[in-house]
Amino acid sequence: QNFINSDLDPHMIRSMCCRLQLDLRELLKRGNGLFGSAELTGSIGVVTLNMARLGYLYKGDEAGLVAQMDRLIDLASQSLEIKRETIQFHMDHGLFPYSKRYLGTLDNHFSTIGVNGMNEMVRNFSDDAYDLTDPRGFDLCVRILDRVRERMVELQEATGHMYNLEATP
């Protein structure tokens, strides 16, 4: 990644994903400090929400869009929890011996929910009346992303696993 003229420092990056930014503060809470945990972290997987489609389906209906997005976030969480459980089961039963030896557990791995097509969501939602560069479109995106972040916190509390939000390509 390019750190010049950005708010990132090289020590903040733990992945080669283009936009994955793990909130390493959660790892600090889990013991061993940042240095002791960061090398043993990653993402279980990424489930991406197609925001452009939601904008199309819920044109002009923000409450409907948010309600459907919440349902999709729940489905994404269920999928990631099943994947986490399955991988951990197989690690514990010898299927992934190197992962078991070097990681031991998936406790320091995030479940990632991504969004894409935010500008297209705004354009579809507004029937092309405005886009992300318009204050109305920008404000809509801020509200949507704030809601997704709220849901990440709820999911962390409900599952005990770390969740993060990513802009997926």
Map each language-model feature to its residues.
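Conserved catalytic cores of very large enzyme subunits
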Residues: 1-107, 128, 134-169
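Contiguous, well-ordered alpha-helical segments that form the cores/surfaces of helical PPI scaffolds
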Residues: 111-124, 146
